Amino acid sequence: MSLLDPRQFLLPAFYLDPTTQALLAQAASTSPCNKISSSSSFRISDILEQSPNNSSHSNDHDPSPQSIKSDFSTSPRASSPGGDRMGSPGSCKKSRKARTIFTDKQLQELENTFEKQKYLSVQDRMDLAHRMGLTDTQVKTWYQNRRTKWKRQATSGMDLLSEPGNLSAVQNLIRSSPYWANYITALPMGTQLPMMGLPMSMIVPPAHAFQPSSSSNSPSTHISSESPQLDVSSNSE
C-alpha cells in the first residue's frame, strides 16, 4: 500500500500538470535557499532527514550566545572620559598620608623647644629634625599644629578672663601664690600683665613682704600679712 502525497489534494491542477512539475523542479534546482522538489513530502522520515541539514545551515548564519559572549570578553573595552574616575569608589578619594607617631622623648624635646621658641627658622628646624631623627616636614607639621593649639588656648583664656568674677580669681591666685609672685617680681617694675592690663606694683606685693619662715625648716617662703591689697578701683580711674 503506497502512501498518498498531500499535495495532490491541495493543488490537484498543478500536481497533475507535467509542465508545472517541470517548472517546480527547475526552480528547486536553481534556488539553493528554497529547495522545492517533487519528491519532498510530509512524511516523518523525510522531515527527520531534513532537520539536520536545516540546523547546520542555521548554525552557519546565526551566532550562538557562547560565541557572542566570547567576542564581547575578548574585544577591548571602550574607555569613556569619566571611566577612570568611576572605576572604583576609593579612587575618587584623595589618599591620606600616614600620621607620624612620635616617641615620648621626641615629644618632650619638641615641647621644650616650643616653650622657648614659638617660631623656628629653616636652619633651626633642620637642626632639630636631624638631632631627633625626623624629617624637616615632620617637624614643620608638628610646629604648625602646636601653634594652632597654642593660639586656641590663648583665645579661650582671654574669653574666660572677660567673664565676671574670673579676673578677680586670677588676681587672687597671683597674690597668694609664691610661685607667681617670685616670677613676676623678677620682671621690671611697671611692666603690665597682658591678660590683666594692670601694673605689677598693683598686683604683686613688694619683695620685702616675703620672709622665710622661722617655725619651719621648709625653705619655702610665705606672704606677710602686711602685703598690700589689690585696689582695682584705682585702675578704673
Curated annotation (Swiss-Prot):
Its main location: nucleus. InterPro entries: HD, HD_metazoa, Homeobox_CS, Homeobox_TF, Homeodomain-like_sf, HTH_motif. Expressed transiently in embryonic CEM (cephalic male) sensory neurons. SUPFAM superfamilies: Homeodomain-like. Disruption phenotype: Worms undergo programmed cell death of CEM (cephalic male) sensory neurons in males. It is found in: Nucleus. Residues 49-98, 209-237 are annotated as: Disordered. GO terms for biological process: cell differentiation; negative regulation of apoptotic process; nervous system development; regulation of transcription by RNA polymerase II; sex differentiation. Residues 212-228 have a biased composition (Low complexity). Residues 68-78 have a biased composition (Polar residues). GO terms for molecular function: DNA-binding transcription factor activity, RNA polymerase II-specific; RNA polymerase II transcription regulatory region sequence-specific DNA binding. The keyword Transcription regulation applies. One of its GO terms (cellular component) is nucleus. Keywords: Developmental protein, Differentiation, DNA-binding, Homeobox, Nucleus, Sexual differentiation, Transcription, Transcription regulation. Residues 95-154 bind DNA. The keyword Transcription applies. Cell-type specific anti-apoptotic transcription factor required for the sexually dimorphic survival of the male-specific CEM (cephalic male) sensory neurons during sex determination. In hermaphrodites, the homologous cells undergo programmed cell death due to transcriptional repression of ceh-30 by tra-1, the terminal regulator in the sex determination pathway. This is Homeobox protein ceh-30. It comes from Caenorhabditis elegans. The gene is ceh-30.
